[in-house]
């Protein structure tokens, strides 16, 4: 129990410390999105960002202990359904230490998009994640177009507009 309570604090401290130490290396809008290859959470196989080149991709980092993730995951389901045929995809990257925690969360908040798992934390390190949830909207050329930190219901309309604009390019 204590371990579960301390884990988010330790992760957040580490992320903030690494951010402080590497401000010059921060991933910014306009940068090429860092590549990743991660195991799928619910099925066999891997998810690689390069497989989605040519699509607009929303890479969303989440965890079962993240309150705003309870709002964002269902909204992302809706956005994916709305824009998928136009070339939009969502990739969710779970950062829970225990797979069961993520699976229990997805039973309560099911998603219809690919979900990967990164227990080692190498991908959030590459993206210099500062908090949860954080997402990166990536254009068809693989460049970061938007960094979306946190989530509230009122974000869904502006996010939808941003996705629609990118899909037209």
Question: For the regions a protein language model found, what residue spans apply to each?
Answer:
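Bacterial N-terminal signal peptides that target proteins for export
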Residues: 1-10
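N-proximal helix/coil linker or "cap" segments that precede and/or mark the start of modular domains
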Residues: 15, 19-35
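A short beta-strand-turn-helix
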Residues: 36-57
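Short pre-active-site segment immediately N-terminal to redox-active cysteine/selenocysteine motifs
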Residues: 55-57, 61-65, 131
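Conserved redox-active cysteine motifs that mediate thiol-disulfide chemistry
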Residues: 61-78
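Thiol-based oxidoreductase modules, predominantly thioredoxin-like and allied folds used
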Residues: 87-99, 111-120
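Short, internal strand/loop/helix patches
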Residues: 103-141
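Thiol-/selenol-based redox modules, centered on thioredoxin-like
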Residues: 137-169
């Amino acid at each position: 129990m204590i371990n579960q309570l301390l884990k988010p604090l330790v992760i957040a401290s580490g992320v903030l410390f690494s951010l402080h130490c590497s401000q010059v290396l921060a991933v910014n809008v306009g940068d090429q999105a860092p590549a990743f290859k991660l195991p799928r959470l619910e099925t066999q196989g891997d998810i690689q960002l390069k497989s989605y080149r040519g699509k607009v991709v929303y890479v969303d980092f989440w965890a079962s202990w993240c309150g705003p993730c309870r709002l964002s995951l269902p909204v992302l389901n809706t956005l994916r359904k709305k824009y998928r045929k136009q070339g939009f995809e969502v990739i969710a990257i779970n950062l829970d230490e225990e797979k069961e925690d993520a699976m229990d969360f997805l039973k309560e908040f099911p998603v219809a998009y690919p979900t990967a798992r990164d227990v080692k934390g190498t991908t959030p390190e590459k993206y210099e994640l500062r908090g949860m949830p954080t997402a990166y909207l990536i254009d068809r050329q693989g460049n970061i177009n938007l960094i979306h930190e946190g989530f509230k219901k009122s974000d869904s309309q502006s996010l939808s507009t941003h996705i629609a604009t990118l899909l037209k390019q």
